[in-house]
From Swiss-Prot:
GO molecular function, one term: copper ion binding
Function in brief: Exerts its effect at some terminal stage of cytochrome c oxidase synthesis, probably by being involved in the insertion of the copper B into subunit I.
Stretches in topological domain Cytoplasmic: 1-19
Record localization: Cell inner membrane
Keyword Transmembrane helix annotated: yes
Membrane topology value: Single-pass type II membrane protein
Keyword Transferase in record: no
Biological process terms in GO annotation: respiratory chain complex IV assembly
Stored PANTHER family: CYTOCHROME C OXIDASE ASSEMBLY PROTEIN COX11, MITOCHONDRIAL-RELATED, CYTOCHROME C OXIDASE ASSEMBLY PROTEIN COX11-RELATED
Protein known as: Cytochrome c oxidase assembly protein CtaG
NCBIfam families on file: PRK05089.1 (NF003465)
Pfam families referenced in this protein's UniProt entry, alphabetically: CtaG_Cox11
Length: 208
């Protein structure tokens, strides 16, 4: 006669172990999903925070000239240009100017598409030192929209800005005598051509 096994039955324990492993895997998957979702949500929040506060050298957008006019104190503004992954030549028409704080000023960048086909780019920007981002106000800028250039096309791109007079009351910037405005154009792979803004399509106006 065959004898039945006398050892303990481990089947329930194995089932409990399998269920515990499944629960742990589910919790880990949920945590990963939440982390990915949070990272995507953090990007627009960070961009909004930078625009509102000027953090990390992010400039501000102004609707009009400041109240009260320009101050006697002047400041030098330097202009920097870069491209990343685009067959473009991109440079400011002047590398440095000195302006009264609060004075609305227009400068131009020149860009040329060296490729034999249409290309589209978007300009990222910041100012240095980073503490002046909240005071650098742009009224109009080519960085507000995508830029599409035809084969070998050259275009002049305006920037209309002023340095907020509130800078003069900021004790942290008492010794500040220069600001650098920097742009970098990046490619947009699948962007559709867009019509030029009215300020860019018309004849060049204004002077430094």
């Amino acid at each position: 006669m065959k004898q039945r096994p006398t050892g303990p039955d481990t089947t329930p324990r194995n089932r409990r172990g399998f269920g515990r492993d499944t629960a742990v895997a589910s919790v880990c998957g949920l945590v990963v999903a939440l982390m990915v979702g949070a990272s995507y949500a953090a990007v627009p929040f960070y961009n909004w925070f930078c625009r509102v506060t000027g953090f990390n050298g992010t400039t501000q957008v102004a609707a009009a000239a400041p109240q009260g006019g320009a101050l006697k104190r002047t400041i030098a503004v330097r202009f920097d240009s870069n491209t990343n992954g685009l067959p473009w030549s991109f440079a400011p028409e002047t590398t440095e100017i000195e302006i009264p704080i609060g004075q609305v000023t227009t400068v131009y960048y020149k860009v040329t598409n060296r490729a034999a086909h249409e290309t589209t780019g978007q300009a990222a920007y910041n100012v240095a030192p980073l503490t002046v981002g909240a005071y650098f106000q742009k009224i109009n800028c080519f960085c507000f929209t995508d830029q599409t250039l035809g084969p070998h096309e050259t275009r002049e791109l305006p920037v209309v800005f002023y340095v907020d007079p509130a800078l003069a009351t900021d004790s942290d910037n008492d010794t500040l005598n220069s600001i650098t405005l920097s742009y970098t154009f990046y490619p947009l792979r699948s962007a559709a051509p867009k019509p030029l803004a009215a300020s860019e399509a018309g004849p060049r106006q204004g002077a430094l």
